[in-house]
């Protein structure tokens, strides 16, 4: 680049693209690696789009800068409009997203200024394109030893003597990540399953998952839902889920400290059988526990340790493929 504006624009673009590359690769390996039907390429779209716009700006700074500015302003308008349509738009949220969205317009303006400088530019500027690719490669090298060779899931129940007691987890069927057509049930739908009219629908709180929840309607075998509550199965607590986390198909030696965002484990847990299905989209399991504000706790397969996720809470009506469940019963 020939001007200070061009050098600043290149540095900012490189930082943004590298961060998106790191986020995309990390989220892909944490959420989507080995999962059936998940388009892994979608995780890399933001970084790829920024990379293409940056490549154009390195070749033709003026035109690339204009496109980046238009993309930044357009994305900002779309994002703010989306928040407004959901009733979530306010000054705090607008300012919180501005560094991500409006920064593109700033970088575009700086590259446009660079484009006004006459004369040839050094070919060394294209080395910047290799940095995001190197970030993806480094992230892959970090994750691949962790995500490959996972123990597959079985279809039957799983019984384990954990630090909090002997637990039995429901087999494949309605007690383990039931799918509702193209979507998955929210915690609120699971917790109010038995409330009239019985079935999956968003029903207002308060919730009593132990009496009205889907798990309470499972028969003793855990394979069928009955017309009346049986009371054999239930959603687990955080302590029970953490104690049952696995690595290499065996218990990972984890314990839970109250309200901590991560577990204390002898080994970093993994998304594998017999507790998890590595080919299914769920990377978190719901618990039966709620906060005083009505949000519900969940536990990631990592136990909140270094490969991603944390023990946290979400609104009860939150439902997506990454938040699953598995019913449990304590044997002793």
Q: What is each model feature region?
A:
Residues 106-132:
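Cytosolic-side transmembrane helix boundary signature
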Residues 16-23, 69-83, 136-143:
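Aromatic-anchored segments of alpha-helical transmembrane domains
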Residues 155-234, 238-252:
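Short aromatic-cysteine micro-motif
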Residues 23-33, 77-89, 145-147:
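Juxtamembrane "helix-exit" motif on the non-cytosolic side of transmembrane helices
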Residues 212-232, 238-303:
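An exposed tryptophan-centered "aromatic clamp" motif
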Residues 286, 312-332:
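Short, structured beta-strand segments at or near domain termini in extracellular proteins/domains
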Residues 122-148:
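Internal/C-terminal transmembrane anchor helices
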Residues 36-51, 79, 91-105:
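Alpha-helical transmembrane segments of polytopic membrane proteins
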């Amino acid at each position: 680049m020939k001007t200070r504006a061009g050098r600043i624009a290149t540095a900012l673009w490189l930082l943004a693209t590298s961060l998106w590359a790191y986020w995309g690769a990390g989220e892909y390996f944490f959420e989507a690696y080995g999962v059936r039907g998940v388009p892994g390429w979608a995780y890399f779209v933001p970084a790829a789009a920024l990379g293409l716009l940056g490549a154009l700006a390195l070749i033709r700074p003026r035109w690339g800068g204009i496109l980046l500015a238009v993309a930044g302003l357009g994305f900002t308008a779309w994002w703010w409009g989306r928040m407004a349509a959901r009733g979530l738009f306010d000054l705090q949220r607008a300012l919180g997203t501005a560094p991500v969205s409006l920064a593109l317009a700033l970088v575009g303006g700086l590259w446009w200024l660079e484009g006004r400088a006459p004369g040839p530019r050094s070919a060394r500027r294209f080395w910047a394109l290799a940095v995001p690719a190197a970030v993806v490669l480094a992230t892959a090298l970090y994750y691949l030893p962790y995500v490959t060779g996972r123990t597959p899931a079985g279809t039957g129940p799983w019984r384990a003597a954990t630090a909090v007691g002997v637990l039995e987890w429901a087999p494949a069927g309605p007690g383990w990540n039931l799918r509702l057509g193209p979507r998955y049930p929210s915690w609120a739908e699971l917790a109010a399953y038995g409330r009239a009219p019985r079935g999956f629908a968003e029903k207002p709180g308060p919730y009593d998952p132990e009496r009205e929840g889907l798990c309470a309607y499972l028969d003793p075998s855990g394979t069928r839902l009955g017309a009346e509550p049986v009371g054999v199965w239930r959603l687990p607590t955080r302590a029970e889920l953490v104690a049952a986390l696995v690595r290499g198909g065996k218990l990972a030696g984890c314990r839970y400290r109250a309200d901590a965002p991560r577990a204390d484990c002898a080994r970093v847990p993994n998304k594998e059988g017999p507790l998890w299905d590595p080919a299914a989209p769920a990377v978190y399991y719901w618990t039966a526990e709620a906060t005083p504000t009505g949000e519900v706790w969940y536990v990631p397969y990592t136990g909140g340790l270094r490969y991603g996720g944390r023990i946290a809470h979400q609104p009860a009506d939150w439902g997506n493929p990454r938040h699953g469940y598995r019913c449990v019963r304590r044997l002793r």
